[in-house]
Amino acid sequence: MGKNNYENAKYWAMLVSVFLMISKVMGFFRDVLTARSFGAGHESDAYFTAMSGIIIVIGALGAGLQTTLVPIFSDIKKNHGREGKNKYFSTILSVTLLVMTIITVLMFALAGPFARILAIGYEGEMHDLIVFLIRQGLPIGIFLGITYVSNAYLQSDEVYGPHALMGIPYNLIFITYLLAAKKPTVIGLMNVTMLASASQFLIQLPALRSRKLRFKFELNFRDEYLKRTLILVVPIIISSTVSQINIMIDKTLASTLTEGAISALNYANKVNTLVVSVFVVAITTVVFPKLTNAVLKRDVKETGALFSSSVNLVQLVTIPAAIGLIVLNRPIISILFQRGAFDEKATILTSGALLFYAPGLIGQSLRMCFENMFYSYQQTKIPMYTGFLTVILNVIFNFILIKPMGHRGLALATSLSMLITSIIMYFIIRKMVKFNEKETIITFLKILLSGILMGVATHFMWKAFTPLMTSRMKEVLFLFVTIFIAIVIYLLATMLFGIKDTRTLLATVKRKFGRKNA
């Protein structure tokens, strides 16, 4: 049963990845259009600074709630059935709306001082624009809160479709505006962001209604599950937003550097986190509820198998992705963004940041897996402490590296802090969970060697193709050819080294789709 469960998790992770990939392709098109319209200048810096402030303060609460509520909802359903679960949904959503409203009012009043913290290098009109955009975008937090609570409810039922699909209308709204507007503005872009955020909840409504869910505003602060949620959510908020806090620190320091440094870090981070937001989120989204249920059943064997499988899958994707981004950082940024207001200078700035963000992709992805393991056991303080450590390390590395390396040093600092704390989390988990550690380490080394072979081959391939790139179209073509061949080389190498997860994943997908076609 355990084997079928984690193989089934691989299949659903793959299926969710397909939908997420469609969404992320649209998201990249959205980013390309944004870069074309605004480039890497003051306006885009103001928008990205305002958005990072909104997400880090208000979005953090929503993200923390989602992670906290999946095991809570599962426990309520187990002990009190569907009716109890639906009743608690109304309670927690009511509290969320109240808290989000209070935070929104406070942020509106304190937007000025907050903007100075976010961008210490900006004064005058630039500062005023950031303040205006923060105030304008505050309703986004309320929409995110509703979305995250609803998403947690559905994920606890192992319903993943709405989560995978919600990015499609979100990106479609952006794309429509950026294509239809004669001259897009950052104020218009913030309005579109609010509308797009609301669409993420609306796409969940059919699935929620099918479970006879009816919302009733109810503030029951004596609810035992609410008390447990409030105790658990604070450390989770801190630990789950470490990446965003680090990025905010990077952007704050980047505001003291050259114009466009903030936008360069933002675009580079978007490219870097594509793998996280598509494949790793898909894996953790599917595995987390299964881990939670396995822990609740005290099934030690299945818990270890699910954990080991998810770690191996994450490594299988992120290690070659990180190596590929390191080798091809310049052509990827050039082809994705260099057009319109996004000139060659912006490409150089952004590709430099991507080069040093890429290694942190591995640490960030593994950290997500490890956090889910702790959350399944409702051990929320450990991720919080390692979160604090990540921020402290990032600040230390920032001040060491910013002078010799500029904005690239900020990116490298983020990567180093993520890698170090993910290693620390691994050593803590190995004392908690019984899993085949030897096999996991051997798999890691095999994947790393496969990735290095792929990286070396990719470097020489691109070097050989460069003289043939006499036009933009040929550059795009050769990049796709290079990436395709690199993937083939990597998969062959993993199969040659006998990495079971490659064969298992392919066999599971083939078997599942084969049944549907039969």
Predicted segments with their positions:
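N-terminal membrane topogenesis motif
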Residues: M1-F29, A50, T91, N220-I236, ...
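Transmembrane helical elements of multi-pass membrane transporters/channels
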Residues: W12-A35, A196, Q200, Q204-L208, ...
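Interhelical loop/hinge segments that connect adjacent transmembrane helices in multipass membrane
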Residues: M1-A9, L205-S243, K301, K431-L448
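Helix-loop junctions and terminal segments of transmembrane helices
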Residues: A63-N79, V281-D299, G304-V311, F370-E371
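Alpha-helical transmembrane segments of multi-pass membrane proteins
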Residues: E123-V149, T176, F342-F370
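Membrane-interface helix-loop junctions in multi-pass transport and translocation proteins
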Residues: G161, I168-L202, P206, K381, ...
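Short membrane-interface helical motifs at transmembrane helix boundaries
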Residues: I103-G124, I323-D343, F460-A464
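Membrane-proximal transmembrane or re-entrant/amphipathic helices at the cytosolic face
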Residues: F460-A518
